[in-house]
Swiss-Prot record:
Name assigned to this protein: Crossover junction endodeoxyribonuclease RuvC
Record's cofactor remark: Binds 2 Mg(2+) ion per subunit.
Residues that coordinate or bind Mg(2+) 2: E67
Cofactor: Mg(2+)
SUPFAM superfamilies per the UniProt record, alphabetical: Ribonuclease H-like
Organism of derivation: Alkaliphilus oremlandii (strain OhILAs)
Length: 164
């Protein structure tokens, strides 16, 4: 099963594509889609959409897993991240992909087995599980790979996390 994991963001959207078969992970690609703050928001969203469209076309993932937004005290930031998340969901939906969402707590539990794990613990587990030589940077990329791993580990419970 090919899984595209997404950590949404307007300035930096992390993505990671893994193949999960027989309890084994293989990394196909990972990276970040970045947009400068000097660019108008609609143009930034178009850039994210185009890049995700290209990635989905190239790798044809079976499913897309995206991190849910957590409550942010900065309303403007939360709205902008929400816009980027919406564009990511739209891109996947336009390719008729099943889309699943996970909270940060669920991602931590799915990757490390502990919901209060810190960022460095998650990053080290991503590195270990995916047999990488170093932790992917920026952090958003490691987070996206963690979302994909979480989805793979969810197994038969995926229907609970499907966006309907």
């Amino acid at each position: 099963m090919i899984i595209l994991g997404i950590d949404p963001g307007l300035a930096i959207l992390g993505y990671g594509i893994i193949n999960y078969e027989g309890n084994r992970f293989k990394v196909l690609d990972y990276g970040a889609i970045t947009t400068p703050s000097t660019m108008a928001t609609p143009e930034r969203l178009k850039t994210i959409y185009r890049e995700l469209d290209r990635i989905i076309t190239e790798y044809n993932p079976d499913t897309v897993a995206i991190e849910e937004l957590f409550f942010n005290t900065n309303v403007k930031t939360a709205l902008l991240v929400g816009h980027a998340r919406g564009v990511a969901v739209l891109s996947a939906a336009n390719h008729n992909k099943e889309i699943f969402e996970y909270t940060p707590l669920q991602v931590k539990q799915g990757v490390v087995g502990y919901g209060r794990a810190d960022k460095s613990q998650i990053q080290q587990m991503v590195k270990t599980l995916l047999n990488l030589t170093k932790v992917p940077k920026p952090d958003d990329v490691a987070d996206a790979l963690a979302v994909a791993i979480c989805h793979a580990h969810t197994g038969n419970f995926t229907e609970m996390f499907k966006i309907k």
